Amino acid sequence: MAQVEDYSSLHRLRKNSEILSNANKILVANRGEIPIRIFRSAHELSMQTVAIYSHEDRLSMHRLKADEAYVIGARGQYSPVQAYLQIDEIINIALEHNVSMIHPGYGFLSENSEFARKVEDSGMIWIGPPHNVIDAVGDKVSARNLAGKCNVPVVPGTDGPIDSVEQAQEFVDKYGYPVIIKAAFGGGGRGMRVVREGESIADAFQRATSEAKTAFGNGTCFIERFLDKPKHIEVQLLADNYGNVIHLFERDCSVQRRHQKVVEIAPAKTLPVEVRDAILTDAVKLAKAANYRNAGTAEFLVDNQNRHYFIEINPRIQVEHTITEEVTGVDIVAAQIQIAAGASLQQLGLLQDKITTRGFAIQCRITTEDPAKNFQPDTGKIEVYRSSGGNGVRLDGGNGFAGAIISPHYDSMLVKCSTSGSNYEIARRKMIRALVEFRIRGVKTNIPFLLALLTHPTFVSGDCWTTFIDDTPSLFEMVQSKNRAQKLLSYLADLCVNGSSIKGQIGLPKLTRDADIPVIHDINGWDIDIKNTPPPESFRQYLLDYGPEQFANQIRAFDGCLIMDTTWRDAHQSLLATRVRTIDLLNIAPATAHAFRYAFALECWGGATFDVAMRFLHEDPWDRLRKLRKAVPNIPFQMLLRGANGVAYSSLPDNAIDHFVKQAKDAGVDIFRVFDALNDLEQLKVGVDAVKKAGGVVEATVCYSGDMLKPGKKYNLKYYLETVDKIMEMGTHLLGIKDMAGTLKPAAAKLLISSIRKKYPSVPIHVHTHDSAGTGVITYVACALAGADVVDCAVNSMSGLTSQPSMSAFIAALDNEINTGITEQNAREIDAYWSEMRLLYSCFEADLKGPDPEVYNHEIPGGQLTNLLFQAQQVGLGEKWLETKKAYEEANMLLGDIVKVTPTSKVVGDLAQFMVSNKLSPKDVERLASELDFPDSVLDFFEGLMGTPYGGFPEPLRTNILAGKRRKLTRRPGLELEPFDLKKIKEELQSRFGNSITECDVASYNMYPKVFESFKKIQEKYGDLSVLPTRFFLAPPKLNEEISVEIEQGKTFVIKVMAIGDLSPQTGTREVYFEFNGEMRKVTVEDKLAAVETVTRPKADAHNPNEVGAPMAGVVIEVRVHPGVEVKKGDPLCVLSAMKMEMVISSPVSGRVGEVIVHENDSVDAGDLICKITK
């Protein structure tokens, strides 16, 4: 049976369309994008192609684009770069596989005359100028001499190479500075050093020669005068073997960094015609004088007086040849191959008078460099690679594909992007569009820098010079790519593999669908179209129109008792560990704006929500405030301000408080509830004054504690009225009564409010309590009847227990006798949403079943009680909860029976847990005070960083606790602190986190430096997680479950988890596969469970003072000693963190550190051995 020929085979197609009968197989002695470019032209000429590659390049794209590919050397025989410099091995491969032509590309051996000679001697065709021409023009010194013979101007320089620093110095003495030392061979900016007056000529010479030797195998250099701010113009030349030379016009290569081209333009935009003509004429003249053959480039500098100077001839193809091809229509690589095979320019139709340019073209080199880090090359795996395209866009790529490994061994270029248009501006705009379309993830790229460059006015005008980048620091004020998709997928992938990492979460959300948004009705019972109906004006508009004082008068004049809804802040702090996220507040915000339009305010910001947003929810609290303000423009917002502490746990410099309050006011806060946790009026005044300066509404607040009607109590009616008197003297728009624990009983409330009202009839009184004992509604009714103007409530499903009293219950209890501004119907409508939120956040619920009248004894604040329970469980004291509550009472009395509000309530809680963990009675604490390592918060309190408690500090306990550790402050803490240098802080943050740092970020950092830094790192890793629906923030999607994530208006990600790969035992990672907007994506995640091994730590001997143990469970965040160091008693050994509590572990004895058992980030249990001290 006759064999049937495969007419569709590539071999058959080539045979039928063969052009070069004497040369049909080409080897490219290079790597990356240039072999691919050459292979493409070779395929068009029906040639077979051969690639070479190093072991490190075995996965590179150029190997796959050739018909055949052969490795250079055995693994480890050559370095990654040396492999491409093995002349004899490359030639042997070519001969062994019947190669007829060798193209050197650019770089590596492209300008090596020995390589060219050996190829010619072997009988193969060298695609490039002959070896003797390379010697003549490749040596820049020889090229300068050639220019002199042709009367082509050159920059003043040495007649030949220089061999010593002394010769370089002689040239400087004759011509002056600045000068440039240049490698005689090679290019690409390597082996070049500019030396200005005052700089070391010796160092520059040594670096230039060393770099040239490394890059090109030849360290020969010469020196010439350096022109300041010239243009770099190069002319593309083509010459055949018969003496014919043409030019393909010029390229403007002035945009450079360290003498390496970054962006190129063809033709030059601003070059005068006469200068262009002179340069083109001189370029052709030089090529003919050198008997040049094949493709090459003559390079010139043009000074600011439009005088041109010849620099060199590059005897090879250039990286930027693509844009000349775009404007002339000439395939330069195909011409190279055919000329080398014997074709004349005339045969190729390349006649000078027939060649013209059409429009403009621009080329950008997209590299894996980080411009923000001085263009430091980035390495790693490309996770996502989506390129540009379309009209006027050309891509010449190398290793740009998803999954490519970017190694540190080679050039960092991924792809060359060239755009063309009928004029310069069109080409520029196409380039901007093309760069914006690129999506490259997994490695840093220079695209943000290129975009900044392309939009700079100097580039727009085409007037750049060779040092433009170095002279223009504003180019580095880049808009970074957000990389939102890949970051979000990284979080979901980690969630799929490792589960939720949100602290405090137990189990999964019980709500597994989107919550329903309720229908809101107006006073006539009609449905309100909340999407298309703007919220009605209310108290906030009055505030904006008339200011804080008239606003206060309007509130006082209201006939009834208004309600502030705390659902958005204190309610979820008290019930759900402050874990409610921004997205769930925003979902109900439009409905709330209508339903609660006559509410006094929404408490939505400040207090614990501020740091928890960053610390645990990975959200920006300022972003939350701005978004909520936009969604609810009509209802006043109130925040909680801890006086001189801001929203921190101890005092800050006064200017930090002023700065914070101003940012909060500008971002949308209207009313500031200002309090001091000890009712220290000096501390309180700092916050009050800051609010006044910012133009906010001041609600100066008295913190209520205990039972004022109980005989002998420290805080009685007389105390509270005297405190109110001083606050009124200070000046406030509203007066707040803040009952954090819910110990304000109805009778006490009636007496307190009526007493204040009698004395101050015109000031609005605003009461806050917690319903821990179950008596909150009764207390509020008493307050309303006694003359209170505002009370704090939460919607039904978010009320009670440690939260605020029920809004609906309060409204119903008043039985319409007192107007609250909110109807029961609207309260129920909003509550329907929050009842579903309780299910969504059920994994943060505290195990509280009902009211706890015991609060009248232990006085634990409502917002703290659930968090304290959670903390106790985290540090191993969950089974000792009753002991902890009892210890809280005892700790309070040890501290002097203080007012307990954040942060002083935290001090009591930390001390209580410390006592239970270390089995200490109050007498033990007093007896051992000078020896114990107390939590930092306790030390802060006794030092005086939180102010001075009413009645002073307990002595001698204070003295003993601080002995050898802290000093005693004798005046307000803020006066002891140096003002923050806010400008310097912002600059430092910008240097670390980029130019996107705002004044609000500075304020966050001032409050919580470590928390802010950690948040920015999470944000850098995962992006903006606030857009992720909560059920997918806390629990992974099911396989093949489609989820939608709206990242901004009109832009939605559609995501589906397709598979989770097996564990890689070598790396301890798994690959998670997603379908993202219909495309497959893969994310590699460390399997943290797979890497976990059971570690049994030795325990410290409690009876041996030389063995230091952990006083409680936590994480080691800092180790301050190492074996062999001398320590004294009380010297810090390490810092332990348990939830929000930090503790310095100090040495119990003096001696030498013998062994340190722990390291940073180690988890330890109570009693675990930290280190040993030897005498």
Curated annotation (Swiss-Prot):
Gene3D superfamilies: 2.40.50.100, Aldolase class I, ATP-grasp fold, B domain. It catalyses: hydrogencarbonate + pyruvate + ATP = oxaloacetate + ADP + phosphate + H(+). Residues 22-474 form the Biotin carboxylation domain. Residues 561-828 form the Pyruvate carboxyltransferase domain. One of its GO terms (cellular component) is cytoplasm. GO terms for biological process: gluconeogenesis. This is Pyruvate carboxylase. It comes from Pichia angusta (Yeast). The gene is PYC.
